[in-house]
Amino acid sequence: MLTNININKMNQLTSENETAKQIVSQLLENHQTIVSMISHEIRNPLTLVSSALQIIEIQHPEVINFHGWSQAIEDIEFMCNLLNELSDFNNGSTLHHSVFSLEKLLKNIAVSFAMSLDSINSNIEFTSKISLNSDNYTGDKIKLEEVILNLLQNAKDAVSEKTFTDSKGSIFLCAEKISDSIVISCTVNGCGISDDIVNTIFDPFVTYKTNGTGLGLALSKKIIEAHGGTLIVTSSDETGTVFTITLPV
C-alpha cells in the first residue's frame, strides 16, 4: 500500500525521469483495470447471495431470530459498500466537468444535512456560512458533493461518539473566496485527532471507525487533487478538528 510519502517520492521521480513516468503510468493503468475486473467478478455473486437472503427473509421471517443471521446481512452489506467505494476510489481522478453554481450546491448540501440531523433528533448544533459571490464554477459536481457529504458525515460520527459535559457538539461548514481560491472548511468542536492518526488519515484502507473501509477520506483527497486543489486537516484538543479544501478558480 502506498502512503502519501511514497506517492510524493513517486511523483518527484516521474517528474525527473520520463521513462519512469511512462512505467508508472502503465502500472497505474494496469492496476485500475485489474481492480475493476476483480470488483466486477466479486460483486456479481455477492449480489446474488444478497438477493437470495432477502428472499429467504421474506418467505421465512423467523430467520431474523437465527443466531448469526443479522451479522451475515451486515457483512454482505459491508462487502457491497467496500466494492462500491473501491470502484469510486479507482475512478477518483476521472472527472466529468460541468459549469455550475458551487455556492448553490454547498447551500443545498447544508440544508439537507441540517434536515437529516433534525430527523433523528440529533443533539448536534450545525451552522454554515457560505458566501462565494460567484455563480460559475467548472468541476465535477457529483464528486465534489460526495466529498462535502463525506466530510460532514465523518464530522457527525465524530461528534456522536464523544461525550460533551459543558456544551453539545457542533459542526461548522464555511465556504468563501480568498484571492484566486475557494476555501471550504468543515470544523468539528472538541474532537481532536492524535498526530499519529492525522499523519495517516488520508492513506487508503486506514480507518479508525467501526465497519469503516478506510477509503472515504482517501477518495476525497484524490477528487480534490484531481480538481487541482488541496485537502488538509489540522487538529487540537482545544479547538477541535478542521478539514480544509482549497480549490483554484
Predicted features and spans:
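Conserved catalytic submotifs in the C-terminal HATPase_c
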Residues: I109, N123-D135
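Detector for a conserved hydrophobic position within an alpha-helical segment of the HATPase_c
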Residues: I224-E225
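Short alpha-helical Gxxx[C/S/T] motif in the catalytic ATP-binding
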Residues: G216, S220
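Conserved HAMP-HisKA connector
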Residues: S15-S39, S50
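Conserved DHp (HisKA) dimerization/phosphotransfer helix of two-component histidine kinases, i.e.
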Residues: A52, F66-S116
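Acidic ATP/Mg2+-coordinating residue in the GHKL
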Residues: V188
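Short conserved segment of the HATPase_c
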Residues: I193-P204
